């Protein structure tokens, strides 16, 4: 007599390296340029803002919530230099090489709970298993930001994304 045994994979934990803190400098008086090497008005940023999959299974990553502090107001259209637009900020986090479009509101973050994707696919980004030969187990990210009026030199604010990472 035979007996078939069926195994079910039950992944109960994952290991991921996520950036806890990073800084950037933004110049409201600069010239707005958004391209692979132009980050709006952000002049300097962390060189390694990266998520790394340390698990043996593939994962997905997205941003599911964004919080702000320091009086900043996240918007999805380019702020003017008028006082009515004081401390308005267009802000995006994208996979390196993916550029947000100025005219595409969905490319820019808003505060609160909303799914936000690191590339243009409209879906969570796939991270290959640890040790992927092509580096697909890591995603390098770049920050894009545009702000104009309402700031003093040395002022600070925070944008805090919540990364949701799941088994693929």
Language-model regions: role of each:
Residues 8-18:
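Proline/serine/threonine-rich low-complexity linkers at boundaries of modular beta-sandwich domains
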Residues 20, 24, 28-30, 122, ...:
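Solvent-exposed, flexible loop/coil residues
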Residues 3-10, 23-114:
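Surface-exposed interaction patch
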Residues 1, 17-21:
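Proline-rich low-complexity regions
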Residues 1-10, 43, 49-56, 114-168:
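C-terminal, structured domain-capping segment
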